[in-house]
Every structure is written in C-alpha cells, then in structure tokens.
C-alpha cells in the first residue's frame, strides 16, 4: 500500500489510498511493523518520529481575498523541519506583506502523500493551490519559490504557472534564494554573499566559536552539503565555494549528494579537507530544509552517509553534524522577503487581460534569458545564457547560439515533454520552431 502512494502523480484514488495505508499500518502489531517492506516501503515510513505535525500550518485555507502570495517548496515529510524551515519563511513573508494572503504549495507529490497518510495533514500541490486561488477569486498572484536555485524544480514551477496565468489579472514570480545562476563557477552575486555569511554565522555560533577564523585556528572545517542536480544550475554550488573563498572563509567547503562535477562528491571533499590540514569537521546542510538528505544522507548511521564516510577515512579527530535548514535563519528569511518585494515592484508576466504581452513590446531586438534542462552542462553558455529576441508586427523570434555544433538531441520545451512519444528532436544548425512560453526581458 505504501508503494501505491509513493508516486509523483496525484489521482482520484490518492486520498483513499493514503487512508487505507494508514489503517493497514495501525492494524499491525509492533513486531509486524518491523517487517514492513516494499520497493519504497519500510518501517520508518509510518514509524519514524519526525516531530509534531500539529505544529505545522499547511496554509490551505480558503477566504484568500484578491491578493495571494503563494510560497512554493519541494517539501519535506520531517515535521519539525517543515514547521521550522518552510514555516519560518512563510511566516516572515506574511509578516512583511500583511495585505497579501500567504498560501503553501509543495511540488513533491510523494512527500504530500506521505504527510497525508501518516499525519492526516493535507498540503496542496501546485495544481491544487492554483485551482484554490482561481476558485477564491484571486486577482493578483505572486509566487515565491523557496528553492535554492534556478534548477529543474524552478523550471517546472514556471511551467505549472504558465497553465494558469491567464486566470489572474497579474502574475509575478520571485527569484529563488541564490538568485541568477550565471555562466561559470566564478559568477557570484549579493544573494550568494548574504547566504554564505548567514550560514557560516549560524554554523560557528552553534559550534561555540566566535568566528570562522577562530574555528580555523582550532583546526575546524565546516562542510556544507548541498543536494546537487544534473541541471546546468549545478554550477551554483561551485559559485558558492567561490563566494566562501571571496569572504576568506578558508575552512569552508561545499559538496553535493548528487549531480556533477565529481569535485563536489563526498570523497573529493574529504580529500580537500584533509589536504587543508583540518582535524575537526562539522557537517551542515546547504539546503533550505533539513529533511531526508540532512538526516540520512548527511548525518545518518549508514556506511554511505557523509558522516560515516568522513569517520571511515580515519583522517579526522572528530566529525559532528548540525541538522538545520537555511529556512530557519532570519537573514535567509530576509532574502526571501527582499525577493518578494522586488517581484511586487517588477512588471507582471503576460496574462490574458494584462498589458505585458508580446504585442506590447515595440518592434526591435532584445536580449533575453533562456534556460536549459540537460544532462550536459552549459548548453546555454555561448552567450552567458542569453538569446536574441526579435519583435516584428507582434511576432517574436528568438535566435539561440549554442557553444558547439556537436550538441545534439535538442528539444524546445520541457524535459518531461521531450520524453513523450513523438517528441521532435532538432538539428540546431537548421531547424526553427514555434513555442509559446514565458519570456523574461533582461535588457532592451
């Protein structure tokens, strides 16, 4: 039954399946619960204590009013982290925007189902949240992602909003935590600097030091573990390493659980810390939420956890962990507040009744951003992620320059659509396509 709800798609049967799975679990004896198994099932699914779910507000109420601020997160089934990390951001945004109703959406249906089945807490997915907004007569919608970067999840969020944007008078999408990605590892910005300063300040305080320098003098290194991604935005982690070095935090190291390049893998980070001569290590997540990855991949007891791997190297006198997400840090919450403020002050996206449509653009040539979702990196690096947009007689044509003629299997659209039967792959040197999408003008 757990396997049946461990899926990313919600169906008409989901509610009944969640209820049935919990009833079946409750009917087992303690001894039987320890024997639960399946492709995605184990005793921890229902049995692990992750905190009091009643302390978390799912923010799925109606009576929204005309102005909604929808806070979109990947989500976590760890109750304490959900209430503290995600809830902390939501509360900060509500306090800063009293004339707007803050509501929540998660993008991970697997997590939504887990929480519903175990705790009977119902959290909206993107479609449910947007339908709720439409049904409540929302006119002005601002979407604030809690995502770390402009990765695949952010792209999927934008795609979901595209389907509903003509239902509102104005729609705005705010920046994720670390802002624009940039073209290579050297590109940093104010958001990355603010996050680097915030996370190191919290890390040294919790470790009992006055500063990063004091920790370094004591032989302590801080390793910040990110998720990682196959998206081109993975370069963000190298940019964070660059930012930490720019701040002269020589005892700060960034690694990732997944994705490339290999120099951010656990084994590579262990070697870097060892070569730098530090004998004490403190692991901390570079993640908005301290959920499954922080508790298991970083701090778990399994031999492949980062804590276990650092200990197994025999290179360090101590290896400790700090299981705290970025979302609970006030300085980080302030960044989200600033991003929402900037979105409110910016031009809205094009809507059916809005004035910010392609026809509103004067004829001419513009520079626009474009994103790629690929197992290859830097597909859009030829001109730092920029394309040339020509507007003539209300029609738009984008010319995209690729870094190499050898790049193949291109598809204009989403990664999900590219995998569908009949998806047409392009010859980048000759093919032209028509595709309706959100276009963000970066400079005229």
Residue spans for each PLM region:
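Short, surface-exposed beta-strand/strand-loop-strand elements in extracellular ectodomains
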Residues: 408-418
